[in-house]
Amino acid sequence: MRHLPYFCRGQVVRGFGRGSKQLGIPTANFPEQVVDNLPADISTGIYYGWASVGSGDVHKMVVSIGWNPYYKNTKKSMETHIMHTFKEDFYGEILNVAIVGYLRPEKNFDSLESLISAIQGDIEEAKKRLELPEHLKIKEDNFFQVSKSKIMNGH
């Protein structure tokens, strides 16, 4: 995973509607072209890093990249959970993401409860790791200062 940190941005699109409704863990979804342009050596799995919506504040996040085996998805997706409570949905806004580390491979779960428990564990682990000085400095990266009108993959 020599591509980490990896920076990308794209417009938030509607996903399957499962994050908030079934899991109680809202996610922002990237369009297919952002997922399709991920470097080949960023394998599927759960990652952590920083995210902002538009030119808003930068928050901790976890992101799932892959097919979500529990739901048997047929299309690869990139679903970001930002550790912040937003007042309203932000479909159509630009999501800026800096992936800084890898937590675990994606895997199937035998129940919705075990999936939720794993995600909650991922969130807690990401919160800890993002306090490391080498990860905190990425929160201040110029990537997050770019105007809303610039949409690009990479840095």
Curated annotation (Swiss-Prot):
Which pathway does it operate in?
Answer: Cofactor biosynthesis; FMN biosynthesis; FMN from riboflavin (ATP route): step 1/1
Tissue-level expression reads: Detected in brain, placenta and urinary bladder.
Q: Name one GO cellular component term.
A: cytosol
What EC number(s) would the UniProt record show? Answer: 2.7.1.26
For the biological process aspect of GO, one term held by this record is:
reactive oxygen species metabolic process
Q: Give the matching InterPro entries.
A: Riboflavin_kinase (IPR023468), Riboflavin_kinase_bac/euk (IPR015865), Riboflavin_kinase_dom_sf (IPR023465)
EC top class, as a word: transferase
Question: Which residues does the record give as ATP binding sites?
Answer: G15, K21, T27, N29, I82, H84, Y91
Note on cofactor: Zinc or magnesium.
**Quick one: which residues bind Mg(2+)?**
T27, N29
> Active site annotated at which positions?
E79
Which PANTHER family does the entry mention?
Answer: RIBOFLAVIN KINASE, RIBOFLAVIN KINASE/FMN ADENYLYLTRANSFERASE
Q: What is this protein called?
A: Riboflavin kinase
- UniProt organism field: Homo sapiens (Human)
Q: What is the lineage of its organism?
A: Eukaryota, Metazoa, Chordata, Craniata, Vertebrata
Gene name tied to this protein: RFK
